[in-house]
């Protein structure tokens, strides 16, 4: 990803999204608020560090596109969702790069494709083409192994609640998760050497009709596109980038506050941040944002909630972006907050005691 300092883009984007949102019938949703019992079940009872680590460990390898490491990770991700019973698609394509033609694979996992509107969580699973002086490859733990593992863990933890179904307010919504290949540039970040997977998928979905949604294309079926990136170290911090989704960011702020008040966050994770919030309500970006996998979708009017740590963590694009520099307790708290957010967005019946961890 690349930081882009352009003052007017946020306003223009908001206008575009407002216009296209009206044209596609997107509605601004009123999200559910969990009771104290629901918060406890979502944040605490469903927490399982060992399961999360089981999902993360296979991601902590070099996984540049069109390599054995990439193929291992693709299998790891697709197997996970197949076992959960989700519908899994792969978007395979070849593209010219500074190092010749490379094969890329995007992964799309959907809980129930027959439901017309999708809450999308997204990340990129590739790692940057970079090596140290001894030839050891860049791992990219925060960039973006941890975001991928968090998404996979959310799917696992909410499996029971998803099967119980949403309340009436969100019967038209399902959960969809996208794992992009080729986010990283091979050399210098340019319009053609970056975002290989997201550019390809956004272009394809613009002309691909969604059979579950009255002739709309698959981009129009996205209720909101939540992109996770640069998550895993103790110095992570999120701010709001887009006015069209600021109400959703404020929902995350409130969830963090509620979980803190009810003592439902990982205490070690909170201590590692010296009491500083993860989601900072008072901080709103005053620039055009960060060039990342949301960009091709943003340009088509898809509402974006960009959850990327800013300022970038200290290990960004350094060889030190590896497992030894992760803070799993902080990531656990982000996981708890996002799990609660997804459940609230989908109006899942979170007080169902049958879905507590056994």
How would you name each of these model-derived features?
Residues 108-109, 118-122, 176-179, 223-229, ...:
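Structural recognition of the beta-strand scaffold that forms the well-ordered cores
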Residues 47-114:
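A non-catalytic alpha/beta surface segment that caps or lines the substrate-entry region
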Residues 94-97, 113-115, 125-129, 182-186, ...:
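Solvent-exposed loop/turn segments at secondary-structure junctions
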Residues 4-22:
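Cleavable N-terminal signal peptides of Sec/SRP-targeted secreted and luminal proteins
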Residues 38-45, 59-69, 93-97, 133-145, ...:
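Second-shell loop/turn segments in exported
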Residues 18-70, 111, 354-358:
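N-terminal hydrophobic or amphipathic helices/low-complexity stretches enriched
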Residues 65, 224, 230-358:
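Active-site-adjacent substrate-binding region
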Residues 136-255:
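Acidic/histidine-rich catalytic neighborhood of metal-dependent amide-processing enzymes
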């Amino acid at each position: 990803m690349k930081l882009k300092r352009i003052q007017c883009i946020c306003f223009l984007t908001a206008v575009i999204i407002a216009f296209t949102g009206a044209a596609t019938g997107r509605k601004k949703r009123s999200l559910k608020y969990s009771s104290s019992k629901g918060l406890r079940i979502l944040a605490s009872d469903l927490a399982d560090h060992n399961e999360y680590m089981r999902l993360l460990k296979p991601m902590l390898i070099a996984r540049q596109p069109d390599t054995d490491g990439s193929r291992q990770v693709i299998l790891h991700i697709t197997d996970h969702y197949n076992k959960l019973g989700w519908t899994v698609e792969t978007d395979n394509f070849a593209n010219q790069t500074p190092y010749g033609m490379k094969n890329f694979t995007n992964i799309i996992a959907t809980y129930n494709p027959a439901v017309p509107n999708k809450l999308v969580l997204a990340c990129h699973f590739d790692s940057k083409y970079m090596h140290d002086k001894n030839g050891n490859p860049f791992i990219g733990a925060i960039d973006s192994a941890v975001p991928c593992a968090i998404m996979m863990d959310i799917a696992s933890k909410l499996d029971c609640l998803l099967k119980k179904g949403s309340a009436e307010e969100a019967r038209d919504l399902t959960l969809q998760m996208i794992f992009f290949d080729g986010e990283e540039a091979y050399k210098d970040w340019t319009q053609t050497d970056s975002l290989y997977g997201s550019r390809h998928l956004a272009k394809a979905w613009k002309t691909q009709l969604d059979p579950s949604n009255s002739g709309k294309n698959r981009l129009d079926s996205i209720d909101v596109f939540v992109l996770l990136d640069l998550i895993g170290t103790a110095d992570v911090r999120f701010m709001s980038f887009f006015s069209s989704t600021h109400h959703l960011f404020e929902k995350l702020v409130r969830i963090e506050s509620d979980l803190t008040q009810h003592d439902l966050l990982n205490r070690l994770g909170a201590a590692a941040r010296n009491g500083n919030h993860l989601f900072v309500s008072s901080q709103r970006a005053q620039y055009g944002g960060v060039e990342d996998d949301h960009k091709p979708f943003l340009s088509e009017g898809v509402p974006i909630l960009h959850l990327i740590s800013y300022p970038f963590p200290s290990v960004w694009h350094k060889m030190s972006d590896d497992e030894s520099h992760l803070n799993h307790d902080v990531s656990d708290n982000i996981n708890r907050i996002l799990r609660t957010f997804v459940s609230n967005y989908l109006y899942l019946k979170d007080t169902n005691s049958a879905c507590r961890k056994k």
